[in-house]
């Protein structure tokens, strides 16, 4: 935060501004660690800092808390991204954006399980990397839910068992108590707006996942979270 207690996240807005100091710091140190705001855009951070060896994206209980850039006197292209979610059983994931761009992934409708990666992985943008690592398909290019036939023994995020598509014709039958938890991604309504539209209250064991599929159709699916 600045002197007015406003949140800042660009290096240019910080005191001291690290950018004009980097040249001298690189002369005096083999390795430099820079802790940045979790709100920073990683691409902009890389442009500002020059050669970066590693980026550590650190979440605690699925809330991104720290972005740490590791610089040294060698040139790394691209840097390795390390994604961790502390105070959880989530395994770490690492990758880099060059490999991410080179990978391919299948897009398809939900299978038996829908998977939601943790915040660190979403911040890193390692979408095809996690799909490739765990053998997953993705719902759509801009919908960051994944899907598989079976539950994974370990996964850095949440897993949901699919019950089926949900709409205004079957919602009262499937949710007679009118209670559900709602998550929306790449969907025209927020979670709160969707709950209001269907007259739902928070709670219960069911999760409604709202998203757009690869054909850009807005859909809702009823699921149960797997513990």
Locate predicted features.
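SAM-dependent transferase fold signal centered on methyltransferase-like domains
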Residues: 1-227
């Amino acid at each position: 935060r600045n002197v007015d207690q406003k949140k800042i996240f660009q290096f240019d807005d910080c005191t001291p501004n690290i950018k004009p100091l980097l040249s001298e710091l690189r002369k005096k140190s083999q390795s430099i660690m820079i802790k940045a705001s979790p709100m920073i855009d990683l691409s902009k951070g890389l442009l500002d800092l020059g050669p970066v060896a590693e980026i550590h994206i650190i979440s605690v209980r699925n809330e991104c808390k720290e972005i740490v850039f590791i610089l040294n006197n060698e040139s790394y292209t691209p840097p390795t991204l390390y994604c961790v979610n502390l105070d959880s059983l989530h395994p770490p994931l690492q990758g880099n954006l060059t490999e991410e761009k080179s990978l391919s992934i299948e897009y398809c409708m939900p299978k038996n399980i829908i998977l939601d990666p943790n915040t660190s992985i979403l911040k890193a943008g390692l979408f095809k990397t996690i799909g490739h690592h765990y053998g997953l398909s993705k719902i759509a290019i801009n919908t960051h839910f994944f899907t598989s036939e079976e539950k994974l023994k370990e996964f850095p995020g949440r897993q949901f068992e699919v019950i089926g598509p949900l709409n205004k014709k079957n919602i009262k039958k499937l949710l007679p108590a009118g209670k559900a938890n709602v998550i929306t991604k790449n969907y025209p309504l927020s979670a709160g707006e969707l709950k209001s539209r269907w007259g739902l209250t928070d709670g219960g064991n069911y999760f409604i996942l709202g998203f757009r599929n690869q054909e850009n159709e807005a859909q809702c699916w009823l699921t149960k979270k797997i513990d």
